[in-house]
Amino acid sequence: MKVYIETMGCAMNSRDSEHLLSELSKLDYKETNDPKTADLILINTCSVREKPERKLFSEIGQFAKIKKPNAKIGVCGCTASHMGADILKKAPSVSFVLGARNVSKISQVIHKEKAVEVAIDYDESAYAFEFFEKKAQIRSLLNISIGCDKKCAYCIVPHTRGKEISIPMDLILKEAEKLANNGTKELMLLGQNVNNYGARFSSEHAKVDFSDLLDKLSEIQGIERIRFTSPHPLHMNDGFLERFAKNPKVCKSIHMPLQSGSSAVLKMMRRGYSKEWFLNRVERLKALVPEVGISTDIIVGFPNESDKDFEDTMEVLEKVRFDTLYSFIYSPRPFTEAGAWKERVPLEVSSSRLERLQNRHKEILEEKAKLEVGKTHVVLVENRREMDNQIVGFEGRSDTGKFIEVTCKEKRNPGELVKVEIISHSKGRLMAATKGN
């Protein structure tokens, strides 16, 4: 039998899709890239914004038209968690709904009709941390915590993924060793507040924090690089930043989700920090790691965001000069504090602000790309580049998170670390050639 999975949203969803495939493989399901041939179609959903939810029902309609007569459609993930049985009412072609914290129950629901499994067990002793068989990969996703205890006014994630619990370190290290033995060179650690690791376990464990975990993972033979997402700026204290800077296996790229450059808006968002505090953390980080790559999230048009508030955001953009920007217009979500507010920034104003923000960021990327020419980076080979069935090079990421396209005549295998020199750029993209390998 064949299964097709459509994955929306974040890296956590990608990891959950891997888990779904692993569970289904025990029932002799094989993954297919063609939904028309599938016996089971799964849509793993995102609910951070309204747009992916609208897309969900469009996707369901399309799959219902092209699927095999007896094929089933299942909806999984965060939208499944908060909409539950309402999905079955709105889309009768859906056979079952499986919440974000119920992935391991896939084998129990695929043979049922109109099944709904979305409840989260909030008894901490009942949490089970099951790892699963994964395909051999150069880069592997690894959960280190589940859920979120933050109360950001705009965010539905605490409702859909439940309380924040850290996975015991010994289980994480055991899984990381298995991945390394299976060929993994780079780990991507996952958690809703990944750098708050160790704040709460499901039972008694030795006191450890995120930096302790990074140090232990770095000792595993075969693991060359470690990345993580998504951290919270509040937990980027001096101690963490210093250990981040010193650990040679921890990639010198970091996600620092700003959300807004206005202290007033940040207070309304319940983020727990100010514009000045955020800039202080960036300044400290750059003092320790001058070449660090920084990515961020920014929401424009949050309720009551004024022109001055937006200008504060633009000011932070200019000062930090982020390497990657994920930016969106505010989207009201159910089960959130801000979702109940009546105040709204007009869509045309929000759209104008978003366009200005994104256009300026594109200019910043081009300015930064010019400065990269002549610099060297060590790239982890991810994919080979081919032209007319001939290998012409490879592509991969630097330690600082830069995606680089490399031209070379020698054959380079995925997983190799290769020194390259940047020779040109185009629209923020970096091109390189091998150097002294």
UniProtKB/Swiss-Prot annotation:
Signal peptide: none annotated. Its cofactor is [4Fe-4S] cluster. One of its GO terms (biological process) is tRNA methylthiolation. Its EC number is 2.8.4.3. The keyword ATP-binding does not apply. It is found in: Cytoplasm. InterPro entries: Elp3/MiaA/NifB-like_rSAM, Methylthiotransferase, Methylthiotransferase_CS, Methylthiotransferase_N, Methylthiotransferase_N_sf, MiaB_methiolase, rSAM, rSAM_horseshoe. Keywords: 4Fe-4S, Cytoplasm, Iron, Iron-sulfur, Metal-binding, S-adenosyl-L-methionine, Transferase, tRNA processing. [4Fe-4S] cluster 1 binds at residues 10, 46, 78. Gene3D superfamilies: Methylthiotransferase, N-terminal domain (3.40.50.12160), tm_1862 like domain (3.80.30.20). Residues 1-115 form the MTTase N-terminal domain. Binds 2 [4Fe-4S] clusters. One cluster is coordinated with 3 cysteines and an exchangeable S-adenosyl-L-methionine. Residues 134-367 form the Radical SAM core domain. GO terms for cellular component: cytosol. [4Fe-4S] cluster 2 binds at residues 148, 152, 155. One of its GO terms (molecular function) is N6-isopentenyladenosine methylthiotransferase activity. It catalyses: N(6)-dimethylallyladenosine(37) in tRNA + (sulfur carrier)-SH + AH2 + 2 S-adenosyl-L-methionine = 2-methylsulfanyl-N(6)-dimethylallyladenosine(37) in tRNA + (sulfur carrier)-H + 5'-deoxyadenosine + L-methionine + A + S-adenosyl-L-homocysteine + 2 H(+). Residues 370-436 form the TRAM domain. Transmembrane segments: none annotated. It holds the Pfam family UPF0004. Catalyzes the methylthiolation of N6-(dimethylallyl)adenosine (i(6)A), leading to the formation of 2-methylthio-N6-(dimethylallyl)adenosine (ms(2)i(6)A) at position 37 in tRNAs that read codons beginning with uridine. Monomer. PANTHER family: CDK5 REGULATORY SUBUNIT-ASSOCIATED PROTEIN 1, MITOCHONDRIAL TRNA METHYLTHIOTRANSFERASE CDK5RAP1. Belongs to the methylthiotransferase family. MiaB subfamily. This is tRNA-2-methylthio-N(6)-dimethylallyladenosine synthase. It comes from Helicobacter pylori (strain ATCC 700392 / 26695).
